[in-house]
Every structure is written in structure tokens, then in C-alpha cells.
């Protein structure tokens, strides 16, 4: 059977509705689109959870050891791939605002590297840092001054510090960046993804005298979202991780059913002299048409879903979701091949009676 004949017969079967291409394509698109869409939304949810975890400063680990934290060692933690930012702080004498002398503000001396941990927006090189909450409460702005009993202080920058479970001390405190060589009380390190290695590294910045009775405490800036967030494990163990294989199964069933229901037609063609290879080629082309169309429709719907979802890495999420519709199309081809391969010419009259 020539290629032109195979192409002509396949096209005729699709055009006349013999292969039920439209219904099978829609079935594949809907089933695989739903399965892959649910998986995509699950992954996007995990991505949003990870973003919220970092935004809440839950990924910031701390070590506390009064007057025993080496600021240089603390800042050097960023040499490790586990830590993206680190800085030290120590409480100092409270500041008395000129406008509200009855309500002193807690103050901290901090290393400049702590700014990256806190997300300080500091366009001015010199001055103090305050939280956005405190700035709003006192009517302060970056570049303005905070009047105190010790004189005016320039507000060099602000940082977000909402009341979401994180260490509340910094919400109404004034942070004074300094380069003075001194020992600090705490070292904060932002590490992502969260691993136990960060805690081990934090302990190395503490220089405790052998006879000291001070406790070294490792903690977390915000404990409200859990001690750790293993994004990789959450992704690998998500309940929808088998969605692509579900799509492959759906495709196989549709491909098999689409050809199995025509076994009388194929057995008759075999009886009339059509070769098995020609029949397989014709069936594969017909299936490729509707499976490809279904994959395109399902993939387009997934693209719209991912685009509208606001996923941080839309390309990666779409590639993951597209695996489902791709496997669905491949499953359909496999199912069709199996169905045609199981047709036997000698069963022609049985197929006729069972039709």
C-alpha cells in the first residue's frame, strides 16, 4: 500500500467522522487539561507557600550569645552556599524621641550586612534604619530626621516588618548601622532553601570563653510557619505528582477504544488484502491527528491557566504541566497501536456477530 493511499485513507476517515477524531480530541484535551491543570495549580500553590515563607522572614535563623558573637565571622557566613545574607545586632541604650519623650524607642547597634537580611531600602549611606510601621507611626520618611534627646538622626532607610509572628522587637526599634569592632549578642542568617547546615554555621560565629555560663541559643525570626520548609520534598511528594501518568493512561484508553470499536472494519480490510503494516500506519496517522489536536487544545488551555495564575516561574510550571498532555498524546498512539495489533482476520465473523 503506497504512502499516498495511506495518507488519503487516513484523511478521509478523519474528515468523514469515521475515526471520531473531534470527540476523541476533545476527550483527551479535557481529561489531560484537567489533570495537568490541577497539578499546575498544586505546584503554583507550593511556590506561593515558599514565597510567603521567605517574605515572613521564617527562613532567617538566629544565634544568641550575649557579647560573644563575632561580627566578621557572622558576615562571612555568606561565603557558604547555604546562606544568602547575614548580619549581627546588639541592644543599646533606648532612644528618647523629642516628640514623645515618655515613650522611648528600643535601639540596636547592627552591622551594615544586616540590611540585606531585613530587606532594608536605604538610598542614603549614613543614618539609621526604622521599620515601615514605625516610620508611618512617627510620620518619618527616608531622608528625613528623627529628633531625639541626643540630637537629630537621619533616617537612611526603612524595612518591612509587619506583625505576622516575626520577632516583634524590631517593629518599633531604631537600628544604628556601625562599623565599630565589638562583640554582638546575635547573628541573623537568611538561608534558602532551609537546611540544618545554617544552624551549624551559626554556632561557629560564637566566641564563648570556656568558663562562660552564658547559653548559646539557636532560633528563628518567625516561627509561625514552621521551623523549616522543604520545598523540594513538598514538590516531590505532592499528591498530584502522578497526573502526567494519569494523562498517559487516559490517552491509552481513548486510543485503544477509538480503534477497538472499529475492529470489524479493520478485520474486513485485512480480509480484503490490506497488510498489517499499512493498517497500523493508517491507524497511527488518524490517531496522531486527533491526539495532536487534543494536545494543542489542552496545552493552550494550560498556557492560559499558568499565565493568569501569576506563577513566579511561569515557563517552568508550563513545561511541567505540558508533560501531561504530551504523555496523553503518546499514550493515545500506543493504545491505538495495541488495539490494531490485536485485531485478527480470523475473528471477522465473531466481530460481525458482536457488533
Model regions: which residues?
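N-terminal Sec/SRP start-transfer signal
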Residues: 1-35
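Transmembrane alpha-helical interface segments in multi-pass membrane proteins
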Residues: 268-336
Amino acid at each position: 500500500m503506497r504512502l499516498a493511499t495511506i495518507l488519503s485513507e487516513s484523511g478521509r476517515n478523519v474528515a468523514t467522522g469515521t475515526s471520531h477524531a473531534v470527540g476523541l480530541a476533545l476527550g483527551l484535551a479535557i481529561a489531560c487539561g484537567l489533570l495537568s491543570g490541577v497539578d499546575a495549580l498544586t505546584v503554583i500553590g507550593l511556590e506561593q507557600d515558599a514565597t510567603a515563607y521567605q517574605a515572613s522572614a521564617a527562613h532567617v535563623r538566629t544565634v544568641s550569645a550575649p557579647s560573644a558573637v563575632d561580627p566578621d565571622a557572622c558576615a562571612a557566613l555568606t561565603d557558604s552556599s547555604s546562606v544568602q545574607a547575614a548580619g549581627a545586632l546588639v541592644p543599646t541604650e533606648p532612644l528618647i524621641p523629642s516628640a514623645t519623650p515618655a515613650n522611648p524607642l528600643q535601639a540596636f547597634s547592627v552591622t551594615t550586612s544586616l540590611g540585606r537580611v531585613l530587606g532594608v531600602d536605604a538610598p542614603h549611606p549614613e543614618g539609621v534604619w526604622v521599620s515601615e510601621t514605625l516610620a508611618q507611626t512617627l510620620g518619618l520618611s527616608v531622608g528625613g530626621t528623627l529628633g531625639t534627646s541626643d540630637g537629630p538622626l537621619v533616617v537612611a532607610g526603612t524595612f518591612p516588618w509587619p506583625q505576622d509572628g516575626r520577632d516583634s522587637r524590631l517593629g518599633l526599634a531604631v537600628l544604628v548601622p556601625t562599623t565599630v569592632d565589638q562583640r554582638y549578642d546575635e547573628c541573623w542568617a537568611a538561608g534558602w532553601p532551609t537546611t540544618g547546615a545554617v544552624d551549624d554555621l551559626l554556632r561557629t560565629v560564637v566566641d564563648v570563653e570556656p568558663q562562660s555560663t552564658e547559653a548559646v541559643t539557636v532560633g528563628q525570626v518567625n516561627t509561625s510557619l514552621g521551623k523549616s520548609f522543604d520545598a523540594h520534598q513538598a514538590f516531590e511528594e505532592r499528591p498530584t505528582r502522578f497526573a502526567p501518568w494519569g494523562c498517559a493512561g487516559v490517552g491509552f484508553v481513548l486510543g485503544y477504544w477509538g480503534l477497538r470499536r472499529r475492529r470489524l472494519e479493520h478485520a474486513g480490510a485485512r480480509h480484503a488484502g490490506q497488510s498489517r503494516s499499512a493498517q497500523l500506519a493508517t491507524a497511527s496517522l488518524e490517531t496522531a491527528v486527533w491526539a495532536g489536536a487534543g494536545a494543542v487544545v489542552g496545552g493552550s488551555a494550560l498556557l492560559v491557566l499558568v499565565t493568569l495564575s501569576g506563577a513566579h516561574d511561569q515557563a517552568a510550571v508550563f513545561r511541567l504541566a505540558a508533560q501531561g498532555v504530551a504523555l496523553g498524546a503518546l499514550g493515545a498512539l500506543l493504545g491505538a497501536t495495541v488495539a490494531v495489533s490485536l485485531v485478527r482476520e480470523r475473528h471477522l465473523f465473531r466481530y460481525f456477530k458482536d457488533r
